[in-house]
């Protein structure tokens, strides 16, 4: 079986396992599917020939590819996450393989009229000639991050079967609950034992990311007073209208749909409620730490103003930091970025360095003492029914993993 065939076989099998995380769950991991998937990977890592294969009580899978060199090479790690996003259903995924893709629109689901078009997704024609894997239009695909996970498995298998490629000790980890921000919560950095690592959790070809948002979450509870609308004058306080009022005080243009690059935002993720009580959940993002703190202060000030206007119980704020910009922790060990950059260039891949408008496990792990940049996996349009992945780009990602390992040994 060649690399491409192994990638397709593993990936299409892995995405059929429902591993969506669940923000409302307090178990670790938050869903049983992640445990099921982790157990499968433990067996397959052993079959490949890795050693020290473990899965702890929290669902974290770790394994070792022993060094095949006498050189003193730093221990490097490669990570991916077990769970898939909660934004769209991930149950009963039916991956569709399109070989030698013609670059034109693909009807994902004729019955539901779900069509993947170049008009909506202009990057689509650039994959002409590739083998791409799409959804059937009814679920997400789960390339985030089963593409990255598959690539690590295939790369480790390749290195075991090609001992002429010299490398130091490599550690592999698969983590649960990344999509809900809890990936590193129970990650044992000391047990992992790597000097630094790479998450395989990026997007299109060439992606190399070592800057992430500073991130916070804000949960607002608006408490109203419900009375009969016919006699409500000077009595009723509509909680949903309080939520609308709060949102109106935020800058309209500082939302995800109006921002790009290094611009931060406020994002209303959900709003549920009625006259008596409404709950709004926001995420707050910015690359610059000062701007990040200013955004949080703005939320606090709006809440304070509304409390003065309507009473302290009218608006209740719970706000917490989620992760910070990893750049601060990557800069002192910049060589790990340089080696990934050089690895890509040597494979005729043009590195595309840009800030992550999101977070990876690496954002938090970098602050836990494990500097962890992020590398592309080949996926597009994550978290929805138009998600797809190029197997040709997945193959390139496997080559990058192998080349990074080789270069660390060569330069030791």
From Swiss-Prot:
<dbReference type="Pfam" id="PF07687">
    <property type="entry name" value="M20_dimer"/>
</dbReference>
<protein>
    <recommendedName>
        <fullName>Peptidase T</fullName>
        <ecNumber>3.4.11.4</ecNumber>
    </recommendedName>
</protein>
<feature type="binding site">
    <location>
        <position position="81"/>
    </location>
    <ligand>
        <name>Zn(2+) 1</name>
    </ligand>
</feature>
<feature type="active site" description="Proton acceptor">
    <location>
        <position position="178"/>
    </location>
</feature>
<feature type="binding site">
    <location>
        <position position="383"/>
    </location>
    <ligand>
        <name>Zn(2+) 2</name>
    </ligand>
</feature>
<dbReference type="GO" id="GO:0006508">
    <property type="term" value="P:proteolysis"/>
</dbReference>
<feature type="binding site">
    <location>
        <position position="179"/>
    </location>
    <ligand>
        <name>Zn(2+) 2</name>
    </ligand>
</feature>
<dbReference type="GO" id="GO:0045148">
    <property type="term" value="F:tripeptide aminopeptidase activity"/>
</dbReference>
<comment type="function">
    <text>Cleaves the N-terminal amino acid of tripeptides.</text>
</comment>
<keyword id="KW-0862">Zinc</keyword>
<feature type="active site">
    <location>
        <position position="83"/>
    </location>
</feature>
<feature type="binding site">
    <location>
        <position position="144"/>
    </location>
    <ligand>
        <name>Zn(2+) 1</name>
    </ligand>
</feature>
<dbReference type="GO" id="GO:0005829">
    <property type="term" value="C:cytosol"/>
</dbReference>
<keyword id="KW-0963">Cytoplasm</keyword>
<dbReference type="InterPro" id="IPR010161">
    <property type="entry name" value="Peptidase_M20B"/>
</dbReference>
<keyword id="KW-0645">Protease</keyword>
<dbReference type="InterPro" id="IPR001261">
    <property type="entry name" value="ArgE/DapE_CS"/>
</dbReference>
<feature type="binding site">
    <location>
        <position position="201"/>
    </location>
    <ligand>
        <name>Zn(2+) 1</name>
    </ligand>
</feature>
<keyword id="KW-0479">Metal-binding</keyword>
<dbReference type="GO" id="GO:0043171">
    <property type="term" value="P:peptide catabolic process"/>
</dbReference>
<keyword id="KW-0031">Aminopeptidase</keyword>
<dbReference type="InterPro" id="IPR002933">
    <property type="entry name" value="Peptidase_M20"/>
</dbReference>
<dbReference type="InterPro" id="IPR036264">
    <property type="entry name" value="Bact_exopeptidase_dim_dom"/>
</dbReference>
<keyword id="KW-0482">Metalloprotease</keyword>
<dbReference type="InterPro" id="IPR011650">
    <property type="entry name" value="Peptidase_M20_dimer"/>
</dbReference>
<dbReference type="Pfam" id="PF01546">
    <property type="entry name" value="Peptidase_M20"/>
</dbReference>
<dbReference type="GO" id="GO:0008237">
    <property type="term" value="F:metallopeptidase activity"/>
</dbReference>
<dbReference type="GO" id="GO:0008270">
    <property type="term" value="F:zinc ion binding"/>
</dbReference>
<feature type="binding site">
    <location>
        <position position="144"/>
    </location>
    <ligand>
        <name>Zn(2+) 2</name>
    </ligand>
</feature>
<keyword id="KW-0378">Hydrolase</keyword>
<comment type="similarity">
    <text>Belongs to the peptidase M20B family.</text>
</comment>
């Amino acid at each position: 079986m060649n690399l491409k065939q192994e990638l397709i076989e593993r990936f299409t099998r892995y995405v059929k396992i429902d591993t969506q995380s669940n923000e409302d769950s307090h178990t670790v991991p938050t869903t049983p599917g992640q445990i099921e998937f982790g157990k499968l990977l433990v067996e397959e890592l052993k079959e490949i020939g890795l050693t020290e294969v473990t899965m702890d009580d929290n669902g974290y899978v770790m394994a070792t590819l022993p060094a095949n060199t006498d050189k003193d090479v730093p221990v490097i790690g490669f990570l991916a996450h077990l769970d898939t996003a909660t934004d769209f259903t991930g149950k009963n995924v039916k991956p569709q393989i399109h070989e030698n893709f013609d670059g034109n629109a693909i009807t994902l689901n004729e019955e539901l009229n779900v069509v993947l078009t170049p008009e909506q997704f202009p990057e689509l024609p650039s994959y002409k000639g590739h083998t791409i894997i799409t959804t059937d239009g009814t679920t997400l695909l789960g390339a985030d991050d089963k593409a990255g996970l598959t690539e690590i498995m295939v790369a480790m298998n390749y290195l075991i079967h090609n001992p002429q490629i010299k490398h130091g000790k490599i550690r592999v980890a698969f983590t649960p609950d990344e999509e809900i921000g809890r990936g590193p919560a129970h990650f044992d950095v000391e047990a992992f034992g790597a000097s630094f690592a790479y998450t395989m959790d990026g997007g299109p070809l060439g992606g190399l990311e070592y800057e992430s948002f500073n991130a916070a979450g804000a949960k607002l509870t608006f408490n109203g007073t419900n009375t009969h609308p016919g006699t409500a004058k000077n009595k009723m306080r509509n909680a949903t209208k309080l939520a609308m009022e709060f949102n109106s005080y935020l800058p309209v243009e500082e939302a995800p749909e109006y921002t790009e690059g290094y611009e931060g935002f406020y994002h209303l993720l959900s709003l549920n409620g009625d006259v008596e009580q409404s709950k709004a959940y926001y995420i707050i993002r910015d690359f610059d730490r000062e701007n990040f703190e200013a955004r949080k202060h703005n939320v606090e000030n709006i809440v304070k103003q509304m409390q003065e206007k309507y009473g302290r119980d009218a608006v209740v704020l719970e706000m917490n930091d989620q992760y910070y910009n990893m750049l601060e922790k990557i800069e002192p060990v910049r060589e790990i970025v340089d080696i990934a950059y050089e690895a890509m260039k040597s494979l005729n891949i043009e590195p595309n360095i840009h800030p992550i408008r999101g977070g990876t496990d690496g954002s938090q792990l970098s602050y836990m003492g494990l500097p962890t940049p992020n590398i592309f996996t080949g996926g597009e349009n994550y978290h929805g029914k138009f998600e797809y992945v190029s197997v040709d780009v997945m193959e390139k990602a496997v080559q990058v993993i192998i080349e990074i390992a080789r270069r660390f040994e060569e330069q030791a």
